[in-house]
């Protein structure tokens, strides 16, 4: 219960504080934010939690074939700061394909984390045409895919 109270206080404080734009942060601050985000994902994995919204960045370690069963999804693996590998399933029926994504690319992202034993899945990396779910995105080489 104490942890829940502290987490609620943290969220309230974060919501009330003035957010700095990424451009205004110095390198040490950017590194601390990146580590903090990766730690959140590592914690979600350790606790086997799902359906939690995350923002982070990482390096593409493998590009997979598209999933074409049902809604089409572009798939690739990304390693985040804690060396955790995430499977991205980016809906290309609702959003543009991430163009020319390749091994070694650095991406930033916002999406929903789903636990799986291999590290986790990130989905909802696109807009929601019905507006019933938070919209996500993937940023590669300065271009945002949503």
Q: In which residue ranges do the predicted regions lie?
A:
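Nuclease-adjacent, charged terminal/linker segments that flank catalytic cores
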Residues: 1-4, 19
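Sec-dependent N-terminal signal peptides
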Residues: 4-13
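OB-fold and OB-like single-stranded nucleic-acid-recognition modules
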Residues: 16-146
């Amino acid at each position: 219960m104490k942890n829940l109270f502290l987490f609620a206080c943290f969220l309230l404080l974060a919501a009330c504080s003035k957010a700095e734009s990424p451009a205004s942060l110095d390198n040490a601050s950017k590194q601390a934010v990146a580590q903090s985000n990766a730690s959140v994902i590592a914690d979600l994995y350790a606790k086997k939690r799902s359906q939690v919204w995350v923002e982070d960045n990482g390096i593409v370690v493998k590009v997979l074939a598209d999933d074409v069963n049902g809604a089409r999804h572009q798939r690739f693996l990304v390693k985040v700061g804690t060396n955790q590998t995430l499977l991205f399933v980016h809906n290309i029926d609702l959003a543009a394909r991430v163009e020319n994504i390749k091994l070694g690319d650095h991406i930033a992202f916002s999406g929903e984390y789903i636990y799986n034993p291999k590290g986790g899945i990130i989905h909802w990396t696109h807009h929601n045409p019905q507006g019933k779910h938070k919209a996500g995105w993937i940023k590669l080489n300065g271009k945002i895919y949503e």
